[in-house]
Amino acid sequence: FFKAETNIAERLLKLQNFKNVKYIKNFKEEISKQETKLAIKLSEKQFEAIEQINENNVCIITGGPGTGKTTIIKCMLDLYKAHKRKVVLCAPTGRAAKRMTETTGEEAKTIHRLLEIGKVEDDKLGTIDTDISPIDADVLIIDEMSMVDIFLMNYIVKALFLGSKLVLVGDSNQLPSVGPGSILKDLIESEKIPTVSLNKIFRQAAKSKIIVNAHNVNNGVNFIGKKDYEEDAEEDFFYVNESNQDKMLYQVISL
């Protein structure tokens, strides 16, 4: 663990301190073009996130559900592709990669597929083959970063060429890695990597009771009742106060 952590820290600093050769000139003008093309209006924090990515080789974008992380990924993807930069999308799991593909319209791979590595029969991550495929990318965007553990992150930083951009996207309060380490959380707390935290829930996401209450739980706020929602809110969250086990099971089944 120590060797992997040390290598991750050293390699990330090398990536970050390497000359930024992907700087896009007339940044505000280019972003304005992307907003028009995608028919969106970036929030102040979203603009800041893309600006930080443009100015740094390594950057973290963090935020809960519905805070606009996917919009940032789509905007970055279009921005760099318009400037003939090769953007590679990946995620730790097949489901996350599929979701990333659906929301961006660009193929996203699992990290294992990207690195061309696989698990052995006993399914232990620590025994993954050390032969990995170099990552040919000007910009590498990793989604659901909270699920990436020490070993996988170590392979990623080894495979990424100096001069590439690395963008880590995720929610440190969600979906921790099965393997050792809390990479995303630790990197944020280190304050060594430029980080933009998104906290605004956008109107469409605010219609979901799951998203609103997920943020409330994180912030130590009570669940909000039906009367507090917008009229067109989705019926996707139910809070049932029941202490009797049999009645509780019945309530779950009846939903």
Where are these regions (language model features)?
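Conserved P-loop NTPase motor core of helicases/translocases
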Residues: 86-91, 95-159, 200-201, 210-211, ...
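Short hydrophobic/aromatic beta-strand immediately N-terminal to the Walker A/P-loop
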Residues: 59-62, 88, 167
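Conserved helicase motor core of P-loop NTPases
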Residues: 172-255
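Hydrophobic positions on the alpha1 helix immediately C-terminal to the Walker A/P-loop
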Residues: 72, 76
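Walker A (P-loop) phosphate-binding loop of P-loop NTPases
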Residues: 66
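Conserved lysine of the Walker
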Residues: 69
